[in-house]
């Protein structure tokens, strides 16, 4: 910023001074401890000059021009190579590491690095050079600070963009702040029936009572035929007629149960026109099939009582209401296992004296069905 104090020239030049010092290969150990090295001739001559009492200018010439002295940087060697040879103002260090003791305005002893003719140094020329180099270093300092500031700003903007676009959705910021778990395939397959199951049961009209179960079964049978099912549909009047023709109604109930459960797989998952318990059963079957496909062939035993069990009951009593009662209660017992809200909205209750296997969602053993039918 413009209000902060700019660094001094010595602070700006500190790193380059260190670089020049170590590039000049200063002597940091006694000669006896130095390991024998194969060195170029100019490096060895530079070390000899550093240990001798020669002037800094001669030492610099002997070292082959590996370093400059005073407050001048290596950039000055490009323009004023001969000036840097004798630019000791009494405060700097020579190229070989010895402190300069010469005067500031001494003339050049000879060409430094090339055939450029020596320039006579004056105090004004040195001051001008110092000012130019200070401006150059300040400019470089500002550029480095500007680059770092731009880099920090860019990284902050990238972070904001990542947070903004992290939400799963087509547009930017869609779903920002909403935690969503699971992949899209899981949400599309098995989560949708569960979510819409609770919606269906919540917005469903009250279920029919036990004594009106024959009407609901006839509706199931009619809808099974309308959905392109394989079951026979002629017995709607027989089921609704009561207990006078008990055995045909039981057989047709068996067929209607088969047609209902088989046609559930052919319907769309959520049919709008159906508000009977068959819609709930269809969602239940869809969830079951998407989760446990290995027990697909066992589903029909889940929804009907076999005709042999119904025929083995005493002929004096009409077995028509009993299978309906058991089956409807069995349906109501299966639904709360997937959703407690479904059990809260149903007027049907569990029957006393019966044992309901709670986690058995997909298969009821025939022996268990026979035991519950005999109660």
UniProtKB/Swiss-Prot annotation:
GO molecular function, one term: transcription cis-regulatory region binding
UniProtKB keywords: Biological rhythms, Cytoplasm, Nucleus, Phosphoprotein, Repeat
InterPro entries per record: Period_circadian_regulator (IPR050760)
Compositionally skewed regions (Polar residues) per UniProt: 245-255
PTM summary: Phosphorylated with a circadian rhythmicity, probably by the double-time protein (dbt). Phosphorylation could be implicated in the stability of per monomer and in the formation of heterodimer per-tim.
Residue stretches of biased makeup (Low complexity): 69-91
Compositionally biased tracts (Gly residues): 92-113, 224-243
Residue numbers spanned by region Disordered: 27-119, 140-189, 219-255
GO biological process, one term: circadian regulation of gene expression
Subcellular location field: Nucleus; Cytoplasm, Perinuclear region
CC per GO annotation: nucleus; perinuclear region of cytoplasm
Listed Basic and acidic residues bias regions: 145-156
Function as written in the Swiss-Prot or TrEMBL entry: Essential for biological clock functions. Determines the period length of circadian and ultradian rhythms; an increase in PER dosage leads to shortened circadian rhythms and a decrease leads to lengthened circadian rhythms. Essential for the circadian rhythmicity of locomotor activity, eclosion behavior, and for the rhythmic component of the male courtship song that originates in the thoracic nervous system. The biological cycle depends on the rhythmic formation and nuclear localization of the TIM-PER complex. Light induces the degradation of TIM, which promotes elimination of PER.
Subunit structure and binding partners: Forms a heterodimer with timeless (TIM); the complex then translocates into the nucleus.
UniProt protein name: Period circadian protein
């Amino acid at each position: 910023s413009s209000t902060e104090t700019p660094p001094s020239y010595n602070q700006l030049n500190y790193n380059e001074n260190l670089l020049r010092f170590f590039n000049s290969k200063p002597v940091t150990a006694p000669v006896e401890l130095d390991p024998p090295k194969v060195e170029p001739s100019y490096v060895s001559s530079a070390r000899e000059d550093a240990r001798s009492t020669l002037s800094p200018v001669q030492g610099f010439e002997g070292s082959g021009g590996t370093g400059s002295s005073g407050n001048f940087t290596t950039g000055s060697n490009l323009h004023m190579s001969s000036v840097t040879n004798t630019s000791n103002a009494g405060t700097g260090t020579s190229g070989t590491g010895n402190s300069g003791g010469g005067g500031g305005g001494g003339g050049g002893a000879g060409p430094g690095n090339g055939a450029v003719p020596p320039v006579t140094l004056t105090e004004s020329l040195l001051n001008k050079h110092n000012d130019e180099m200070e401006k150059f270093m300040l400019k470089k300092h500002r550029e480095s600070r500007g680059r770092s500031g731009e880099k920090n700003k860019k990284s902050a903007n990238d972070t904001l963009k990542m947070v903004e676009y992290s939400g799963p959705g087509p547009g930017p910021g869609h779903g920002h702040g909403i935690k969503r778990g699971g992949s899209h395939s899981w949400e599309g397959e098995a989560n949708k029936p569960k979510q819409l199951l609770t919606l269906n049961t919540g917005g469903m009209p009250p279920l029919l009572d036990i004594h009106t179960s024959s009407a609901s079964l006839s509706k199931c049978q009619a809808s099974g035929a309308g959905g392109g099912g394989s079951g026979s549909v002629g017995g709607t009047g027989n089921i609704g007629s009561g207990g006078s023709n008990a055995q045909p109604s039981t057989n047709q109930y068996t067929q209607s149960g088969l047609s209902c459960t088989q046609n559930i797989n052919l319907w769309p998952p959520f049919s709008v026109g159906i508000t009977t318990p068959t819609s709930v059963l269809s969602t239940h079957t869809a969830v079951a099939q998407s989760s446990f496909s290995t027990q697909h062939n066992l589903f029909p035993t889940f929804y009907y009582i076999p005709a042999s069990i119904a025929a083995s009951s005493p002929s004096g009593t009409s077995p028509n209401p009993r299978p309906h009662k058991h089956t409807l209660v069995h349906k109501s017992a299966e639904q709360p296992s997937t959703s407690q809200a479904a059990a809260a909205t149903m007027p049907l209750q569990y029957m006393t004296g019966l044992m309901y296997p709670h986690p058995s969602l997909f298969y009821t053993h025939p022996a268990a069905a026979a035991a519950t039918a005999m109660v």
